[in-house]
């Protein structure tokens, strides 16, 4: 129901008299340009939201790179990220509000995430707890930790007006946010490309590829897993610190569903750029671009009128769909191979 609905309804069912019908038709023609203007205004609002969606997508893309390390390289499901993301935001906001240098606050956010990843790694490797359960345990513990960091408050604001000169990213300055996010993405990908090209990086990749063979070659797989958890959650917390600056507050629940968004970004990047991006650095970039595409799609869906409450359900459906694609492809390939084998057997 909008401003022009009465006119449209009246024209759809005109009054008995021809004069009444002509009157409605005349006014419908008069307001038609305004209907077009309304549509153009909606499209303009969507286009104006794109830079913000790109900036936010890049921030979440950094988080997706962290998830990429455990999910793709170590072949482990780590649910710590839902907690460590909020930890990074909480540490950043509290430190910045306390007068700390913003770069030092970002570093502390990263280290807090590394500590969370270390705990998960120890629970998994030293206590024999499955990775997914170890991540859940750490995530639950981090909820209380995040509340303590924010002095028992569920939400801690960070005024963009008061700290506008020191914040690296902010909703009030999208252009600066895009540049800063681009720099962070480039530096992180460059550092990870270098790291995974070292002997330690190769051993970490070997651990995720084939643990038994890695152990046979004298690689300490337990230590490598801990390192992977540490690096992954450090990047996730760094992303949380950037998002806290961008939105102007830290919330104890800001990381809820982060793992799903991270998986969505990785899968979208793999589906869209998988055949083009073969290099390791480009695969990391694909995860970031997947996050950007995800948030552009979210903006478009909201523009179409989908209730914001349904976004989590939509994200879960998209992730489930794309995770099932490889399975379906395998089943189809099996059906094609079997008839070919039967033909050869008959021959």
Positions of PLM-derived features:
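Single transmembrane alpha-helix segments in multi-pass membrane proteins
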Residues: 48-101, 106, 122-127, 267-277
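Cytosolic-side transmembrane-helix boundaries in multi-pass membrane proteins
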Residues: 209-216, 220-223, 282-285, 297-347
